[in-house]
Amino acid sequence: MHCRVLLALTLPFLCLNAMAQAPDPAAILEGARLSASLTKLEKGLTGSIRKGNHKTPVTLFLMGREIQFQFSENPNTPRIFHMRMGDSSYNLFEIIDGKSRDLSANQLVAPIAGTDLTYEDLSLRFFYWPNPKLEGSEDVGGQPCYKIRIDKPHNTPGRYEVVYVWVHEKFGAFMKIRGHNSKGGLLKEFQVEDIMQVADKVWTLRKMQVASHDPESGRRISITDVTFDSPNQAKPRGLR
């Protein structure tokens, strides 16, 4: 099965260094989802998501104030999805015959190409939930990060009730995400392993591991790897 995905996964990584320095959690998250710098990448970001031996090509694009991703088991009949940035409803839409249709609650949590990533994960829609709370600073992989808690608004669909996000204090890129259920059980963890510079003071994801967990035992069930290539204009610089 050969699949191609246009997704917004790395969009919240892109930010200016100054935005991440503010100790206000709303400002930190706003900086983490800034997209203006993505317009500097005319061809977007290309890479892949891989689970086991199956690899799915991925490409990230920004269309004005909309982030879009495309998934298709058949390259000739792609399915296109989008979310408008700053939309307080946090809804994802599928474009069918030129018209936007809401994704159902079940579709939001459906896996993409058999991986640990869902449509909810690809859009990182929880970054748009209101009233984030700063819980302090912690190191992630030896890197100083702000730890932010985001609670799901009432009557909002999705698996996660509480999401914790660790944002790099210097680069402004998120370094780790943990999604929990209503009982506090860990459902999924996103662990960034490397970032890269794509423009002046703009950093984005190079490599990340996404792991699904058993919320009762905390045991890791399965893993998906996400990797992006360096743009031609980028001068990559890893964390380690």
Where is each model-derived feature located?
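N-terminal cleavable signal peptides for secretion/export
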Residues: 18-62
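Ribonuclease/tRNase effector modules and their secretory precursors
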Residues: 47-48, 70, 81-86, 95, ...
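Gly/Pro-enriched, hydrophobic low-complexity segments
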Residues: 144-238
